[in-house]
């Protein structure tokens, strides 16, 4: 994506929905069918070919990349998302920052969907005054949209400090 700061938007946002909405013209002009959103603080090494193939095969509206972890480290400053998954990989529930996670399926902070789905979700949320894509859109749409998890078995690290940045880059 281009920088969120534009002639019409000075870079002060009310949240992720506002930020995505500010670059919607760029997104609409893109010829790509799919959009993949990834956080800037997560480190992993993968291509998305298998994730895209599963997304198409399952007919998912949204696919989340996840890995299997034990406990969340309390010193990590970013949101932790845990998924309840059916046997076929369909997301049946999402927990945000659970104190006692009920599942080992932890988000890698990557979400994929068709560009038209993303455009609709952002425009709809923006028109209602929603601010956070995770809380106001994804968490609320679990039973409404067809969401699946794609398991990633490689190394995943969450950068929350300068030493963490170096350690995760060495480990990747």
Model-derived features: where do they sit?
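Unchanged
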Residues: 1-170
């Amino acid at each position: 994506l281009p920088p969120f700061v534009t002639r019409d938007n000075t870079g002060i946002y009310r949240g992720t929905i506002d930020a995505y909405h500010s670059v919607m013209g760029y997104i609409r002009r893109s010829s790509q069918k799919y959009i993949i959103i990834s956080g800037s603080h997560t480190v992993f090494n993968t291509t998305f070919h298998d994730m895209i193939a599963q997304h198409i095969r399952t007919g998912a509206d949204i696919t989340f990349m996840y890995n299997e972890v034990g406990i969340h480290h309390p010193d990590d400053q970013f949101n932790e998302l845990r998924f309840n998954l059916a046997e076929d990989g369909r997301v049946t529930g999402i927990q945000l920052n659970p104190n006692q996670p009920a599942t080992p399926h932890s988000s890698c902070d990557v979400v994929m969907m068709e560009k038209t789905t993303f455009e609709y979700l952002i425009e709809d949320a923006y028109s209602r005054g929603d601010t956070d894509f995770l809380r106001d859109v994804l968490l609320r749409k679990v039973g409404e949209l067809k969401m699946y998890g794609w398991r990633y078995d490689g190394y995943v690290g969450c950068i929350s400090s300068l030493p963490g940045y170096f350690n995760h880059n060495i480990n990747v």
